[in-house]
């Protein structure tokens, strides 16, 4: 039986009319004068390839999802009218100085007969704010209400409503905006708690009245680098907060909801944040010259930069690059080389990042060692971390991986910090890359999570590929079978979220890799982790 066939015999059973007929509703928008009125004042008009005019192609970021988690009145997708609404026109717009004309939009929903819900598409006039609009208010604009069971594409005209003859490509003119809002909630006739999603794709083509104006001289071509992520399995990468390899992926309700690490922070377009630096071996390292504290085994180190140049406390960073970003006691090796004769020495040393003497922003930290006379003043000295230790009767009470040290001491304030991150969409949680730090004494909490592997930080910095949206959709692939295990969002500010709301933690094996799929908007609803339900996608 063909559900949506136009010539199918009507059914008198209970399953009749499960799928709606073709949507013949027309958006209440009259055609307006396009580029034809601009030609007399512009002096020239330019021809667009007929193939571009005749074929619908997916708009950049033109895919969104609807799930039961979305509430009526939530804007699922929005885009202003302009060349960026079509990838071909976006490419051509670099050759011209202006444009005029509208678009034709085709909406394809992954319809099926077992879900219910409606999405309203509306054309919002230029310079009209879309924040805070309710579904009832949106019906006052030219609109079309589409059932999620709709199988046939829905056509929407987008005329170029403007108060001038044409738009400059370099100007930020306000234009007609197409928005998609949830009109009635998505629901299914099953009794389970499984979360399902319906995908929608938005395709566009220029209307017959669209044309570019004013051909501009060519300049030196600059290629836009495509965005990628390293094709490395999790176990092949290293932690960006301590020089150790990664062991697993971790998420769950027992993990922190809001975190603010300072190492391993990098935006997707390659901007380093906090105390992040590029060399994995320099994480949690200190270098400088030491001074002995009389009557003790303690030494104070006057810090230097990673290249042994003088450290400037006024630099706009929270602390010297690579400084530990958690409170705890780090044990390692303090090594020194004498410049005059090249002699070397090394001793076990411990630095407490929660101590009142831990003031890296001011240029000094204090170490406890096993010697009181072997280190010389004024010589190049370096601290290399080995692991963490714990003191006291309360097991695993330190290190506290999400507590920031006081970089300026207990009397100062931390400045120039990388911002805190947290999930921004209902039903999502942070995904962490987890390692186990070596324990050197006591019963320390050896789990250490980072937001990005160090190899990703280096890759993003090196490529500096521009972000086309606030969110990149990634999929985690099993390299042995090629099967996609789950999907996740990589946010532009440099952290990953997944859809997981269960009362249990998820620990994922490290033998998979991430693959970049596409740029999506922040309202994209991820398929849930930890169950066998997949996403029904529009073809």
UniProtKB/Swiss-Prot annotation:
Q: Could you tell me which species this protein originates from? A: Lordsdale virus (strain GII/Human/United Kingdom/Lordsdale/1993)
Any one GO CC term of the record: host cell cytoplasm
Residues with site note (Cleavage): 223-224
**SUPFAM superfamilies (alphabetical):** Positive stranded ssRNA viruses
Question: Which parts of the sequence are annotated with region: Protruding domain?
Answer: 222-539
Q: Which UniProt keywords apply?
A: Capsid protein, Host cytoplasm, T=3 icosahedral capsid protein, Virion
Report what the protein is called: Capsid protein VP1
Q: Where is this region: P2 sub-domain?
A: 275-417
Enumerate the residue ranges of region (Shell domain). 1-221
The protein's matches in InterPro entries, at most eight in alphabetical order, are given as: Calicivirus_coat, Calicivirus_coat_C, Rhv-like, Viral_coat
Span list, region P1 sub-domain 1: 222-274
Asked if the record carries the keyword Acetylation, the reply is no
Stretches for region P1 sub-domain 2:
418-539
Family recorded in the similarity comment: Belongs to the caliciviridae capsid protein family.
Query: What is the superkingdom listed in this entry's lineage?
Result: Viruses
Tagged with keyword Cell inner membrane = no
